[in-house]
Amino acid sequence: MTTFWAESAVINGVVTPSVRITEVDGVITELTSTPVRETDRVLPGLVLPGLANGHSHAFHRALRGRTHGDGGTFWTWREQMYSVAARLTPESYYDLASAVFAEMLLAGYTVVGEFHYLHDASVYGTALDDAVLAAAANAGIRMTLLDTLYLRGGLSAAGGPLPLAPEQQRFSDGSLAGWATRHASLSPARNTRLGAAIHSVRAVDPDLYADFRTLTAGAPVHAHVSEQPAENAQALAAWGRTPVRLLEQLLGPDFTAVHGTHLSEDDIELLGGSASTVCFCPTTERDLADGVGPASGLLAAGAALSLGSDQNAVIDPFEELRGLEMDERLVTGERGRFSPGQLLSAATADGYRSLGWNGGAIAVGALCDLTAVSTSSVRTAGAAADQLWLAATATDVTTVVVNGAVVVDGGRHPLGDVGALLARAIEEVLL
């Protein structure tokens, strides 16, 4: 048992002063408003529920600051990403992912949904999968491994299926049965669990979705959806339906559509009516020039929203939640597209729910995952407590608790100099 004492904490959306949080075996068992005791672990500043990173590709972090020289497009960026994927071994993947997950913790993330499609099972068996699971445990972050089905190279402009290119072979299990066999052999460690993903309608034929749904019943299921207009055009050419309509049988509270940038009104109604989640990744969607998706429209239709760092060009949960609001302001010319509480919910409880965890809330029975933020930095000084997350950055995170254990203390991670770890891991992959 551990007792934490928060100077102030967000409970049920309300900033509450002087809160003692008692946890047993990683679960919050009691909340009381009381003065601090000598035996309490003090959490200064404002304590938020743990922040959820709903969508990540850890190895993409190696490309940060390396893709801007010639502009290019999403599709040319993808070729650079393939080049990194081709160089990874289980050992180098473990080193890189450990450092990336440590960076996420320093930024305040407590759980990550790792959208994992680098398998290469014919060469490594489950070693690449095991490396990611072990990296999360090494860093101390909670993780849902979204084990991804990826069976073909994409679609032509006319909608015809394309075979896997040589650089995509490492992503594929060859068949749904091959994916299911490998998936069943995975052994998640403590604080990790398995989810599943369809990479996209480009990479998996819709004829397989019913069997995939049966194989993954009860697990969180994610898919990239309508990130680029070309995907919509290809799907319409191939099947006469949008990606969301093709995925209709998978929609529901356990399903998350990642990006959802270019959606029709029918798509919005389908996602909202099924109570699906849509995971927006504002910093990546800016970086890759994807566009700005209809987040407020989805929320109004009944969908939940979550947030992710995706390619990890930026790892800052506060920038993602700000981006959800600020990007819509630019598109609509209106402020207040979301309330501060709605933004925090997307970054916490709704993100946890989309990854299959009972967390993202400071409440009895919830996982004891907490993020403490300084209220006195040059960025947060003077900010209203109930809007602090709209002023803070990752740099303002002081303490992070996962499963009742402190994993970031005073802005420091147990692995040491995370910047140096990242530099070494990236050099190992790129040079």
Functional labels for PLM-detected ranges:
Residues 124-260:
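Metal-coordinating catalytic core of metallo-dependent amide/deamination hydrolases
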Residues 1-19, 24, 345-431:
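Active-site microenvironment of metallo-dependent hydrolases
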Residues 65-142, 174-189, 423-431:
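Alpha-helical scaffold segments that flank or form the walls of functional sites
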Residues 229-241, 267-272, 289-298, 313-329:
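Histidine/acidic-residue-rich catalytic or RNA/ligand-binding cores of hydrolases
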Residues 247-254, 296-377, 391, 401:
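His/Asp/Glu-enriched, well-ordered alpha-helical/loop segment
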Residues 215-220, 251-254, 270-279, 300-305, ...:
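Glycine-enriched alpha-helix->loop->beta-strand junction motifs that scaffold or abut catalytic
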Residues 62-95, 121-125, 152-173, 229-253, ...:
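Active-site gating loops and adjacent loop-to-helix segments of metal-dependent hydrolytic enzymes
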